[in-house]
Amino acid sequence: MYKAKDTEYKLGSPIHEKIPSFEIGSDRRLDIDDNEGEEVSARDEHDDDEDYEYKRIIEEEFENDREFKDEHGFEIGVVDNDENNDQDCEADTSKSIGSLPRMPGTYDFSGLKSDDNQYNELTETLNQDDGNQSNDIAVGKLGDEASHTYKSTLDPGKPLQNPPPSNLNIDSILKSQLENNKSEGSIGQRIDSISRKTTNSSGGPNIMKDNTLDRIPTHDYENIDDNNVFNRAGDPKIRGGLNASNDASINDNIADISQSTIQTSTDAGESINKGNGDITKGLSNVDVNDTSVNKSKQRNISSGSVIRNPPSASQANQSNQSYHQTRAITPVMNQMNKFQGSNSEASSPREHLGMGINNSAPSTGANSNTSSPMNGSYPNSIAKSRRSGNRVKGVFSNMFSKNKTSTSVTSSPETHAINMKISTPFNAKHVAHVGVDDNGSYTGLPIEWERLLSASGISKKEQQQHPQAVMDIVAFYQDTNDDNPDENAFKKFHYDNDSSHSSIYNATPPSTPGIPSTYNATPLQSEKQLQRQQSQKSQSSHPVQVQSTPKTPNNNYENQFIPSRPAPKPPSSSIPSTKTIKPPPVPPSPSTNTNISPASKKNSFMGRSFSSKSIKALRNSNRKISEPPKAPQSKISDSNTEMGIPKSKSHSNSLSTQSEVEPTKGSTTAPVSSTAKFNSTTINNINGHNIIEEEKNNNTLLSNPKQREQKPDSTIEKRDTPPSPSQSRVSEEESTKKETSEKYNNKENDIPKKSSQQPVRDAKQAALLAQKKREDKKRKNQQIISKLQQICSEGDPNELYKDLMKIGQGASGGVYIAHDVNHRSQTVAIKQMNLEQQPKKELIINEILVMKGSKHENIVNFIDSYLLRGDLWVVMEYMEGGSLTEIVTHSVMTEGQIGAVCRETLKGLRFLHSKGVIHRDIKSDNILLNIDGNIKMTDFGFCAQINEINLKRTTMVGTPYWMAPEVVSRKEYGPKVDVWSLGIMIIEMIEGEPPYLNETPLRALYLIATNGTPKLKEPEALSYDIRKFLSWCLQVDFNKRGNADQLLNDKFILEADDVESLSPLVKIAAMKKATELDE
């Protein structure tokens, strides 16, 4: 009987059930004295028959056990610790000692009394010895007994219905064993070790003090080495240093039992056997150097009973919970134990008696690394492994995704999904600033500007002499050459427009001084110029240059700088709404045009008409032949097709250009002043200029959308008679208020212009802005269509005009000649335009209204207009002689002939100026002649309206080579800009080309701004009268410049020839043109 600290322990299930099977004629017993710690000694030896039966049972047990070892682990469950534990804990005899891993349970030594039958039986059975035979057990086969199981608190299985009674004398067995194994350590110490490794069931009382065993973690691993068990029989080496004479079955039994238990932590609390020195001391004498011990295997800690899962078909299909597993304790994994393979090095079952001391050494077996999942946790480990794999996969997936990334593979799934949206720059500052230092040198000049200035021939000395002029012309060049990639850098600096991008060709750009307008010069120009460039690219159907240029090798360059220059706007309308877009300057060049620099090819402004040479060059460059349509219904949308050459090429081109709305041109016609005296019949009872101004205001007042929306078409007044004086005063007051509001708007617009250069950061804001601009553009187009329907006549032009023959092609339509059905002898010119392809529909309305209200002998007569299925048909007088450019190119004009052209032109300008209209694009391309030499002006698309209030304009439009210095310098200007252009046209008629045509466009603008009056190549060849007249027209100070009335009274004009003198020149030009066609 053994007792320690008033706590009784007894051998728990199933060992007391196995002991009767070992009592086969054994006379030897072990006796243990609880208080004295007597050693157990061997008494009898088993006879051979009994020993054989014993080993047979053990072998069968181990053979059956092998069926489970590879698939299952073992857990320790807590055994209920009641007084009748020996009766409650029943075990199947098949799960005998031979199946060491299948002998779990808690050994309750409180029940082992020296006078107890079970104690005696245990000691007798355990000390049975076979004498000469070793205690090693050979594996046998155990038939059907493998189906029996223990109670749920022990190894899972079904308990025996009628367990055999136990009458072992455990006390005598243990005493005998302790005496025989004194050198090896007492059995009591081993049992004490075993008792300290076991814990109570979750549902039963705790056998340890202070509930210490409840804190012991569990491990779900069990190691089984069948080779070790099998090779133990007959192999004395396995016994290590044990004394053969003292070998008893208890040694192996206890060793096997220890192998089936999971090593408990030494911190399990105070030892139950604290007062039994011999028992405790004996445990330390376990031979840890036993060669058979597999040192790589060390038991782990568990506070549960060893529970075995039932057999399953596949290891992968094992459930997460053990069969009949106790619910009290959740296993805690301390280390990963693996099953030993069949070829692994043999190990002793006593290897785990070291009470947590790691005596392990790496195994050298071939399959020693073969692993097996732990019982009850294998599916969890698989799940963890799979989760880990999925986690790693997710990490790499997120790493290359746009919005997610992972900072650690081991981080949780929530941590790797990080939003990778890259924020836009914040607190950004635009520090680029161009200035001039004390030495006159530029500071902060962008590289693009330096390269541009250097390539354009403007030396640093010239830049230092006129820094402001350089800045002005660079800004102007930016406006007129917006789609040049080299000049995109300009948009990054202070010259930026707030005009909307509802259309790249929106017509009314801001005209604030010092702020250049771009092709997108509309009041809605709040988008970035980069977006404008993209829009321009999208508008490929509207080539920027379709106008004819002088016939020179550098026709591409000339095509970009085709002369077409409307007059600037007055200051009052200089708000962003009234700013017009610059026309591309390409002067008609005579034979000397071949000297155009290549750099000018890539830098050009849009022209509005083609010269005969430019037509030929365009035809050669495009290599496209446009067949004249047989039916007028065909829409001319191919802007790249070759321009058909009519009888009067320049005239037909001018006709085509009148309808063509260049991206660089903006409608700048201001409302007709209250004193303007247009006939009501010509305006069709509609103040067309008010329509244009209303459209401009709608475009410019972006900041006041309500005001823009509140301007209905009903505001158009019918003016059958001039307004009364009271009405005039009212209109003046309204104009004053309007001017004030426009100036206020300009001040407001100046502020956002600085920040408009910054890109839109918020994508949603950009989308809303784009949507708003699309809506504005749509609304604007609807308004224009509505106004055109009011202006145009009803009917089908195909029924009114017959024999249509195409003579030219423009950017958005073709030019035809036809005969009036009612007057077969009358030949008319018809411009057919597709409104959808028109970049700036406002120019069309402007031109129609100006021509309707301008009935003059020196202005091309407007006949009628029709709007048919989206096509606008403009019918006007046909000038078969072509443009003045063709005469200048092919002929040398006398001073009398030059005077005749100037006189007729001044008559037309006087008429327009009297109506408050500035043409702003006077050049040889826009002067048409008939076969009799009569001269008429055309192309009123860039006309601007001025009145008493707004006498000046600041918008830079027109062709640069014919442009006045005040326009280049962005100063206020008035009708006298047309007089300057007339003086440049005189030089063109004298020398065959305008000044600076051979210079790059940027340098030409610089020279116009800095040189003032251009100098003639051979001034001594001219008379004093023409030089005086020319000097009067080309005064840099527009206040000293003569007006149309004054110039008409000049001696040079009074002594000029009649227009009939021009008829031969027209015929010569026609002949040379025909010759060119034949060639």
Swiss-Prot record:
Catalytic activity from the UniProt record: L-seryl-[protein] + ATP = O-phospho-L-seryl-[protein] + ADP + H(+); L-threonyl-[protein] + ATP = O-phospho-L-threonyl-[protein] + ADP + H(+)
Compositionally skewed regions (Low complexity) per UniProt: 309-322, 523-548, 591-600, 679-690
Region of interest called Disordered, as start-end residue ranges on this chain: 21-50, 79-116, 148-220, 261-323, 339-389, 501-766
EC number: 2.7.11.1
Stored InterPro entries: CRIB_dom, CRIB_dom_sf, Kinase-like_dom_sf, PAK3-like, PAK_BD, Prot_kinase_dom, Protein_kinase_ATP_BS, Ser/Thr_kinase_AS
Amino acids binding ATP: I807, G808, Q809, G810, A811, S812, G813, G814, V815, K831
Gene Ontology terms for molecular function: ATP binding; histone H2BS14 kinase activity; MAP kinase kinase kinase kinase activity; protein serine kinase activity
Top EC class, one word: transferase
Function recorded in the entry: MAP4K component of the MAPK pathway required for the mating pheromone response and the regulation of cell polarity and cell cycle. Phosphorylates histone H2B to form H2BS10ph.
Protein known as: Serine/threonine-protein kinase STE20
The encoding gene: STE20
